[in-house]
């Protein structure tokens, strides 16, 4: 589930996201970054653990950064169904640089692109199945599984895919 994951981009978050995707994707590109000079850094998968079961990923407008790397790869490879609403659209890599006086500056150092080369910055990723969260649930602190119409739609999709496979 990448729904609600905000802008927590750090090197270890990218690495963790890529490690998760290496357990799912076929051989190929996971994501790549490109700096202002066009220098490209690729993150790849050997395909040794390709996931072959039904998969649904919940996304929304708070799904950003590493959550979009994950969702973008799943969508580009077609190995799962994105359910929910359009993601945030944060396709940049930022670094925080500490200054001598104790302050810090946040610098954008590169952009990232999905395996198909899609630039999602300020655009987001559209889900395969759009499901708005019920209005009555938007301000609730806790939402049960039974109430969560986006989750219920994802479960329904997985059940349909499972039945089709049998």
Regions found by a protein language model. Name each.
Residues 11, 64-66, 81, 114-115, ...:
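Short beta-strands and strand-coil junctions in structured, solvent-facing domains, enriched
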Residues 12-19, 26, 116-122, 130, ...:
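Intrinsically disordered, Ser/Thr/Pro/Gly-rich linkers and terminal tails that flank
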Residues 13-65, 92-98, 113:
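Gly/Ser/Thr-rich loop/hinge elements
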Residues 77-90:
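Short, well-structured beta-strand/strand-turn elements
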Residues 94-97, 105-138:
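Conserved P-loop NTPase
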